[in-house]
């Protein structure tokens, strides 16, 4: 039995996917049952990395999603539109969907999955998070007997590359970003990466799977890495930390134990933490569950090979079902998505965590005492408060707190910022507790 598929997009990931499908030797035998019937592209004249018959290429994307011979549509276009509309149109024509589009799933997942369940088709998205790291399927299947407590990940290779180079070279953000763009690791407009938006899309998806409820993308608190300086990285190193952009879904971090904390932000993590050694363009995801404890997933988070590997694994899953089932089998609950309720999400002000903060203060007697009093007025307990040195004639003071409610900490900073001796608060970074 041959299963015909159609691809929407033939960029880096699309080309990598076709390369795997055209070279089945030594891979899953199910690959030999797959025929690429159509590939949607913007231009028929553009040079390609892969060899495909001219009749396979088309600029008519709607013809692919409505073709009665095509059983699986692989969406690799990226972006919100027309990707969302084409996915929904394909579902309405009873096509199974494989996608690497985290932005569409994070924002329109409920709409897409409702349509898929209504029409009896699958929407699989292993490639949407973590590139080649198998994390979606383990959360849905292998870890199903666990009560997930937290998911903590380095989910964006661009920002991890930038922070890794800033750490190893002592370089500033702008300098490393420019180098990353020249090497092709960062886009000309890097906002989705460096502002944390890409990682926020991904943690919204993982949280939905891990905690068994829908997640609104706007409920993910999001901060990027533009404000992280070489100075902070150096001080973090002296304190026994490294700085990483973490995406966190935590069922235990807020005052309300029934609500999740969903957040993306630069974070100080101890050097002996499992994620501290995830460097360069690599991704890592640490899942904590009961009774398993901790399990970590690690690998290349982007690129043609890793992402195409995840795409093809989803295609193989669906092909296996099609070739071994009755004509209209019931959806496998381990592959489909059926939850209807939304996860309750706690506001970031209720987060309980530690903080690192750097102050530039006038070099006058009593300034450290005034800082300590300002924190004490709001119940903020300090782990350390030390004067590191001088910058532009100001005393540079670094504070690390014990666990504190974020709202209380921010109130303390507001009071402290009004002190005459406090000239600037350049950095406020959370510390992973």
From Swiss-Prot:
The keyword Ligase does not apply. NADP(+) binds at residues 13, 102, 184, 187, 303. Residues 356-433 form the ACT domain. The active site is at 202 (proton donor). It comes from the Bacteria. SUPFAM superfamilies: ACT-like, Glyceraldehyde-3-phosphate dehydrogenase-like, C-terminal domain, NAD(P)-binding Rossmann-fold domains. This is Homoserine dehydrogenase. It comes from Synechocystis sp. (strain ATCC 27184 / PCC 6803 / Kazusa).
